[in-house]
UniProtKB/Swiss-Prot annotation:
This is Phenylalanine--tRNA ligase beta subunit. The lineage of its organism: Bacteria, Pseudomonadati, Pseudomonadota, Gammaproteobacteria, Enterobacterales. Keywords: Aminoacyl-tRNA synthetase, ATP-binding, Cytoplasm, Ligase, Magnesium, Metal-binding, Nucleotide-binding, Protein biosynthesis, RNA-binding, tRNA-binding. One of its GO terms (biological process) is phenylalanyl-tRNA aminoacylation. Tetramer of two alpha and two beta subunits. It comes from Wigglesworthia glossinidia brevipalpis.
């Protein structure tokens, strides 16, 4: 946001130097990016009037101009400009003037004739933002005073303050809001300098009809008749809006932009004579269209919020004005001005849908408008229109539906929580004074304040922590004590049943992973490709369209990171991240469930190609080994199970859900090839996701004495269906043998001509031991028979060999 220093000072009741203003803006929480002087240093440039022009007797290219500087001083200026300058007022550097490049203008003789000055161009004077054709001579309007210093005419003793406004301080996106915030820092309340009510009872006989009160709870409008648009915009208005980044066009557009910068509320103006019947706010129907220029129209999608008259759509609400009711400076004499409050959820996405990139659309879509500013804005616009364009105003026609207006925000601010977060003591009286200066109203009840949020902060103050942030910022971060030794610190008792997150991170790092930190906000379109059946949590006030929803998982971040690195020739990538992911769930507060995950992704080739080894692409079992090692930190790895599942996000045959004691704890698999093709991913990507809260408990393993009794080994080869997971076979073996089973290992899997179709041969090695005595062959065979019997009963296996 850019704004004029002079304009800002009009609203400040205290006299501050520029550095102090910058410091206060920074303290508010905004960033002053730079200060741009409106012009470079120069002096002696005057406004002069061209009286006459004649050809130079000795040079065909030059002309001699007679310039009136004041009533007593008329000078000659020799230049190559033409006679079109006669009777026009221009900027002249007279004898002794100093230009921005430090050149001193002196009298010169050109072919025997004296020239006492030069005509100035915008480029010569280095005036910021004035005119695209900066090499043109500065020609001024008829009202310019002859002999006046050009600095005074253009208000050049000014600076442009360039501010980066954070998304949680949208109340500072206008002159009034920023002035209010600065004034509060000096224990001053902002004086309302725009109390200019236009008291009119004239009824010009037009009505508004709101079909969708939920989408448009407030609509204020008035008709102004007999205005004159054939007037030039006053230089102070055009220069102020120009310094704020708006290009001056005509008196009406300039006034609208001026009020927008001043109040933050947009004003819509229609040609009253081009509107048929009532103004109606409604949702569009199928196959409706709107003219946006004389020869161009756009198709309006169904259920878009629009403003229409009897015949056609005249505006896409809060986004784009149509052509049919647009004002014309040559023909318009009656206008309708409107100041409207729309609810952002009914507008969000329309700017992208209709390719409109404007500050107005951005603010309307993100609930960045003060719901109580509409009256002030429409009266301010009316005042300026009447002041410069004359006219006869009608009464304001109000439509206000209190049911759908933003509800008053009441927040409980507890003293205990305030002091716990701040870490130091602030007196109750000072806290209450800070709240008042920031515009909050409060009531103290027992141990908390019941705080009412002002309308201009409703877009960004929602919870107790927002109030604490405001109080600490106002109090001054520089005043926070360095020594916090008196702060009460809670120590958690160290328990052995906690598997720390740091241990997990260290393990993954030791296995070659790199930790990344990514935004919680992700691209909605990419996330929809990865999670097509899940509804993400939208951001009301997103940083950009690429960061418009909360992440459902880390997979979106991983894929974008891997793509970025693959495009830069990184062949081997192993990354992980831990943090919260979010999903919609009505059972939780605010309807949002947040879960803490530790997740990872691998892609590329396992090793570098060399004379002793070939390059191998990472496969499912590589990442499964990493996950199993991570799960071993739990101390009870035997209770984890990997079960294949059907999931559109993963490759159909290369994924597993992970369970711990039959409770879901995570998932692992290869990203679906269809998703990889859509996102133009070169190498296969394998990912895992673990619910940290479900695996962080550490189970101390039981310790046994090492027995002197030797082990017994038995191998069983069986044929089973491909549909039967091997984990189920292992589970049956464990349940059958129990105490005597020391270890079970699958050492061979075979499929070939000797094995019937749809089946596989599995070889299992059982390690058996009795802790107290040597087992006999009879006992061992009895155990094996029991195991085989249970396998046959559950899976209809065929025995190949037992040894």
């Amino acid at each position: 946001m850019n704004l004029s220093e002079i304009w800002l000072r009009e609203y400040l009741s205290i006299n501050l130097d520029l550095n102090e203003i910058i410091n206060r803006i920074t303290k508010i929480g905004l960033e002053v990016e730079k200060i741009i002087p409106v012009s470079m240093k120069f002096s002696g440039i005057k406004i002069g009037k061209v009286i006459s022009c004649k050809q130079h007797p000795k040079c065909k290219k030059l002309k001699i101009f007679l310039i009136k500087i004041n009533n007593k001083n008329i000078i000659n200026v020799i230049s190559d400009y033409d006679k079109s300058l006669i009777n026009k007022k221009i900027a002249v550097a007279v004898n002794g003037s100093i230009l921005p490049n430090r050149t001193i203008v002196e009298k010169k003789f050109l072919y025997g004739y004296e020239s006492c000055g030069i005509f100035c161009t915008y480029d010569q004077l280095k005036i910021f933002g004035l005119k695209e054709t900066s090499k043109d001579i500065i020609v001024l309007d008829k009202n310019a005073i002859i002999g006046e210093d050009i600095k005074n005419y253009f208000f050049l003793n000014d600076n442009i303050i360039c501010i980066k406004v954070s998304h949680n301080r949208c109340d500072c996106l206008n002159i009034i809001g920023l002035s209010r915030a600065i004034s509060s820092e000096y224990n001053e309340l902002l004086e309302n300098k725009l109390i200019n009510k236009i008291n009119s009872t004239k009824d010009y006989g037009f009505k508004i009809k709101i079909n969708e009160p939920e989408a448009c709870p407030k609509y204020l409008t008035r008709k102004i008749k007999y205005i004159n648009l054939n007037v030039n915009t006053p230089i102070w208005i055009s220069e102020r809006i120009r310094r704020s980044g708006f290009k001056p066009k005509n008196i009406i557009i300039d006034i609208i932009n001026y009020v927008f910068i001043e109040t933050g509320q947009t004003i819509k103006i229609f040609d009253a004579d081009k509107i048929s019947g009532n103004i109606t706010v409604r949702f569009s129907k199928e196959k409706e269209s709107m003219m946006i220029s004389k020869n161009k129209k756009i198709i309006i999608q169904k259920n878009t919020l629009v403003v229409s008259d009897k015949n056609s759509i005249i505006e896409i609400a809060g986004i784009l004005l149509g052509y049919s009711a647009r004002i014309d400076s040559k023909t318009t004499i009656n206008i309708i001005i409107s100041s409207v409050l729309y609810r952002s959820k009914f507008l969000f996405g329309n700017s992208v849908k209709y390719c409109i990139n404007s500050d107005l659309a951005y603010r309307n879509e993100r609930n960045m408008i003060d719901p109580n500013i509409q009256h002030l804005a429409i009266n301010r616009a009316t005042e300026l229109i009447l002041r410069f364009c004359c006219g006869s105003p009608g009464k304001i026609i109000n439509y206000i539906n209190n049911k759908f207006l933003p509800k008053k925000i009441l927040i409980k601010l507890y003293k205990k929580k305030l002091y716990e977060i701040l870490g130091f003591f602030i007196s109750k009286k000072l806290i209450e004074n800070i709240l008042l200066l920031l515009g909050y109203k409060y009531e103290f009840i027992k141990n908390y304040w019941k705080v009412s949020v002002p309308s201009w902060r409703m877009c960004n103050v929602k919870i107790e922590e927002d109030l604490i942030s405001d109080i600490s910022r106002f109090y001054g971060f520089e005043k926070i004590p360095i020594d916090l030794s008196y702060k009460k610190i809670k120590y958690n008792n160290c328990k052995y049943n906690i598997n720390t997150l740091n241990n997990a991170k260290k393990l993954l790092t030791n296995r070659g992973y790199q930790e990344i930190i990514s935004y919680t906000f992700v691209d909605k379109n990419i996330q929809n490709i990865i999670h097509p059946n899940k509804i993400p949590v939208p951001i009301i006030n997103p940083i950009s369209t690429e960061m418009s929803v909360l992440r459902l998982s880390f997979f979106t971040n991983f894929i974008q990171t891997i793509l970025y690195n693959q495009n830069r020739q990184t062949k081997y990538i192993k990354i992980f991240e831990s943090g919260f992911c979010f999903s919609k769930n009505k059972k939780y507060k605010l309807g949002i469930k947040q879960s803490f995950f530790i997740s990872g992704a691998v892609s590329g080739f396992k090793n570098v190609e060399s004379w002793y080894s070939k390059q191998r692409e990472i496969d499912f079992f590589d990442i499964k080994g990493d996950v199993e090692t991570l799960l071993y930190l739990n101390g009870n790895s035997s209770d984890f199970e990997f079960k294949t599942c059907k999931n559109k996000e993963f490759h159909p045959g290369k994924n597993s859900k992970i369970f711990f004691k039959k409770k879901y704890v995570g998932i692992i698999g290869e990203i679906n090839p269809n998703i990889q093709n859509k996102l133009d991913i070169k190498n296969r990507i394998f990912v895992f996701e673990l619910l940290w809260d479900n695996i962080k408990n550490f189970y101390v393993p039981k310790i046994y004495n090492i027995s002197d009794i030797p082990f017994n080994y038995r191998d069983i080869s069986i044929v089973i269906s491909n549909k039967i997971p091997i984990i189920e076979v292992i589970k049956i073996c464990k349940d059958s043998i129990k105490k005597e089973l020391i270890n079970i290992n699958i050492f061979d899997i075979y499929q070939g001509k000797e094995i019937k179709k749809g089946h596989k041969s599995i070889s299992i090695r059982l390690t058996l031991q009795n802790k107290n005595y040597n087992m006999t062959n009879l006992e061992i065979n009895s155990i094996l028979e029991k195991c085989i019997c249970n396998l046959k009963k559950n899976f209809l296996i065929e025995i190949r060999t037992i040894c």
